[in-house]
């Protein structure tokens, strides 16, 4: 029987507090925008299936992390078991962009010996008139770290699907090439799920009769 999903990828969404991590995830997983969103305390969990090719689905397990310093010791524990991540900054908040380097360095320390595929996300692009970070400098920073760059808006649903699906496809290609593998004790990538098939007693009897012929 065909698998419900081919692989499960665990993703983590990181960045400073108030950059809009929870809003972006809820727009992607629930299709809605929350005008008022309470700060994440520790870590929240979401999931969604994504079809990357016809008939090929990936289950995304998405961890929404708190950006406040007092919760960092909790969120660091989730780095190691993630295979991919969105690193968010707010295009209207230059400080959140300047802190991208710090987030990447922290992740690098705690993810060993595994790797995380990141996409850099400039969020709140609907507020372009208040922009404090140019697209050019964001693209330059992303290139320096070997990341893709994309600008999104949870409020206006701009590039939200693309951010998650592009990241998923990048990870999938690495898995297909054998550069990322399923490993015991690591939750980043898991193999697909095939549901158990319960046969009726009549079907079992017919099968047994065929075997006796």
Curated annotation (Swiss-Prot):
Its cofactor is Mg(2+). It is a lipid-anchor. Specifically expressed in neuron and neuronal precursors in the brain. Expression is high in all regions of the brain with highest levels observed in the hippocampus. Its main location: membrane. The keyword Magnesium applies. It holds the Pfam family Ras. The modification Cysteine methyl ester is found at residue 213. This is Ras-related protein Rab-39B. The lineage of its organism: Eukaryota, Metazoa, Chordata, Craniata, Vertebrata.
């Amino acid at each position: 029987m065909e698998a419900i999903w081919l692989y499960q990828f665990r993703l983590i969404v990181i960045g400073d507090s108030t950059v809009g991590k929870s809003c972006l995830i809820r727009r992607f997983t629930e299709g809605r925008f929350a005008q008022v969103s309470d700060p994440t305390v520790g870590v929240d969990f979401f999931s969604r299936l994504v079809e990357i090719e016809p008939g090929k689905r990936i289950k995304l397990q998405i961890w929404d992390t708190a950006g406040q310093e007092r919760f960092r010791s909790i969120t660091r524990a989730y780095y190691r078991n993630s295979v991919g991540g969105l690193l968010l900054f707010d295009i209207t908040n230059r400080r959140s962009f300047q802190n991208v380097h710090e987030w990447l360095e922290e992740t690098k320390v705690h993810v060993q010996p595994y790797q995380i595929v990141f996409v850099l996300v400039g969020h709140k692009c609907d507020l372009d008139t208040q922009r404090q970070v140019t697209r050019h400098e964001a693209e330059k920073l992303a290139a320096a770290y070997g990341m893709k760059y994309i600008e999104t808006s949870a409020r206006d649903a701009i590039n939200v699907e693309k951010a998650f699906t592009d990241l998923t496809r990048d990870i999938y290609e690495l898995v297909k090439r054998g550069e990322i593998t399923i490993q015991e004790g690591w939750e980043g990538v898991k193999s697909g799920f095939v549901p158990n098939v319960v046969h009726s007693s009549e079907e079992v009897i017919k099968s047994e009769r065929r075997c006796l012929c």
